[in-house]
Regions:
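Short, highly charged C-terminal tails/helix-capping segments
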Residues: 30-32, 143-160
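Short catalytic/metal-binding and nucleic-acid-binding patches
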Residues: 164-165
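A hydrophobic membrane-anchoring alpha-helix module
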Residues: 109-150
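A generic signature of intrinsically disordered, low-complexity regions enriched in glycine/proline
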Residues: 14, 42, 123, 133, ...
Length: 165
């Protein structure tokens, strides 16, 4: 359930980003990148353009949802390590009551992932808050310090445009 709602949110978010950027930029590479970069890079872009999404109350839950989905999909890895460190409440620890080394969450793996109905509701509420908070428009500012991935894609678009002349 969580993976389904997260992936649907992700697709709708990327579509919105694509549509917004299309108002002020038309390069193929940049627009294609919107569908391939990780969400963190899109958040980085919005910070550069003035929308500080990381400071919003819902961001932590959206990010946690992303981690949960990644652990569910990929198993052990960096997302699991982040859950262990920052959000261990999503990992069931059968030895928690013993204390000591047995209760250390670093011994847990993807099979210990547990998501409750309450967690699902929190994720859903964060997504609703996100959509309600969305700026009406995202515009490019000449003074914005755009992320490297975005600038690199612009350079490729410009090179392709020059080659087609």
């Amino acid at each position: 359930v969580v993976a389904g709602i997260y992936h649907e949110w992700d697709k709708q978010f990327r579509k919105w980003v694509y549509d917004e950027i299309s108002h002020w930029y038309r390069g193929e590479i940049v627009l294609a990148k919107i569908w391939t970069v990780d969400v963190g890079k899109l958040v980085e872009l919005f910070s550069a353009l003035g929308w500080e999404i990381r400071n919003k109350s819902y961001f932590q839950k959206l990010n946690t949802c992303r981690l949960v989905v990644n652990v569910f999909k990929h198993g052990d890895g960096t997302s699991l390590a982040e859950l262990q460190q920052h959000y261990p409440e999503y990992l069931y620890n059968p030895f928690d009551s013993f204390g000591g080394q047995l209760s250390d969450v670093t011994h847990l793996d993807h099979t210990n992932l547990r998501v409750s109905d309450e967690h699902i509701n929190e994720f859903s509420e964060a997504m609703i808050e996100f959509w309600l908070d969305l700026p009406e428009r995202i515009v490019n500012s000449p003074s914005a310090s755009l992320p490297k991935w975005f600038e690199s894609a612009i350079l490729i678009d410009q090179k392709n445009e020059n080659n087609n002349k």
